[in-house]
Amino acid sequence: MGETPFWKTKGLEEMTGAEWESLCDGCGLCCLNKLEDWDSSEIAWTSIRCTLLDGESCRCKDYDNRQATVPDCIQLTPKAVREISWLPPTCGYRLVAEGRDLYWWHPLVSGDPETVHAAGISVRGRTVAEDGIDIEDYEDYLVTWPLEVGREPAD
């Protein structure tokens, strides 16, 4: 038997930088633009991706400098993960913060960064870049799929 995975034995604050970064499954969901209803505070998801999110790799094109280009980019920290209500239900950070295990398709579990895409979790092929889209038109891009958990592997 191997060692117990770090995400089952460490709190978010105890993780090394590399462990923390590896909790990201590469789905790209957190980089989708969202709308908030001012009256109810309800969050609605759009299929519009951040200008820095690569729609195929589902990774940031300039991760280290992202906040210089996108000032309202949210940097996830253990505190932020516990406070942000809109993190998708499949988010590795959210799952670990809630004391839950990672899904089968998470690269730390599967050993393959492509399983997040094969399971239908990621934004790959389902988004449009925000460049050139007026904020008034965002409602035309509302979607619910970011709240879905994904497909089980075929036997």
From Swiss-Prot:
InterPro entries: Puta_zinc/iron-chelating_dom (IPR005358), UCP006173 (IPR008228)
Source organism, top-level taxon: Bacteria
Pfam families: CxxCxxCC (PF03692)
NCBIfam families: PRK05170.1-5, PRK05170.2-5
Protein family: Belongs to the UPF0260 family.
Protein name: UPF0260 protein R01011
Organism: Rhizobium meliloti (strain 1021)
